[in-house]
Amino acid sequence: MKIDLNCDLGEGYGAWQMGDDAAMMSIATSVNIACGFHAGDPDIMHKTVTMAKAHGVSIGAHPGFRDLHGFGRRPVPGITAAEIENLVAYQIGALQAVAALAGHKVTHVKAHGALSNVACEDDMTARAVAAAIKAVDPKLIFVVLANSKLVDAGEAAGLAMAHEVFADRTYEDDGNLVSRRKPGAVLHDAREIAQRVVRMVQDGAVVSVTGKIIKMRIDTVCIHGDTPGAVDIARGVRLALEERGATVVPFARR
């Protein structure tokens, strides 16, 4: 069995650093790099791309709403499809340019924060994100939350997709993530998370907060790099998967 581990990196800004990117880079097989709207800047983007190239890690754009103060986790009421297409295309293009400068190549796109959360449940937003990706480069892989509106949008646009589950997030009965505003939305116990990921990958399913089993395709597992103990959690997940015979490899190289 083959599985990818992805992580959101490059989410600092200026002198401020978020998480231990260097350590996470040695564990993840694909990384999603902030493109300046919710976090990141040209220097951090270049540094992150360069590290990824050195580790043989695939890179993707991680576009979000323009919201540095809110880290891209706040919705933007009234935003239009055209505005979403523009901001997504802008951020993909920014990372492509920085990647070219560093001698690496962007392979995928994964929406960040509120943009992703809204797109998972709203057809217009999901289709706008997919349309922007297709317009910039139809060969880019669209990372989608399994069983969400993003899957429908990716299929309609004819994009290759990597279906994602989250190692440290809990799920509602409809397959969407429990809101971070609710208690228990984010898990922190490294051993529990590792065991949970192994079950998800082996069974092709997640278990919701009420115990409902939700079958889904799983190509990649997201491990957040900005939570307490992130490096230990990521290392534990990878070790647990490999001990059970999984090959951890970038989805872009399968």
Curated annotation (Swiss-Prot):
Entry keyword annotation includes Metal-binding: no
Pfam families xref list: LamB_YcsF
GO-annotated biological processes: carbohydrate metabolic process
Signal peptide: none
A GO molecular-function descriptor: 5-oxoprolinase (ATP-hydrolyzing) activity
The keyword Calcium is annotated on this UniProt entry: no
Domain of life of the organism encoding this protein: Bacteria
Keywords: ATP-binding, Hydrolase, Nucleotide-binding
Enzyme Commission number, as recorded: 3.5.2.9
Catalytic activity: 5-oxo-L-proline + ATP + 2 H2O = L-glutamate + ADP + phosphate + H(+)
Class of the enzyme per the UniProt entry, highest EC level: hydrolase
Biological role: Catalyzes the cleavage of 5-oxoproline to form L-glutamate coupled to the hydrolysis of ATP to ADP and inorganic phosphate.
Family note: Belongs to the LamB/PxpA family.
Subunit structure: Forms a complex composed of PxpA, PxpB and PxpC.
Record's protein name: 5-oxoprolinase subunit A
Native species: Rhodopseudomonas palustris (strain BisB5)
Origin organism lineage: Bacteria, Pseudomonadati, Pseudomonadota, Alphaproteobacteria, Hyphomicrobiales
Gene designation: pxpA
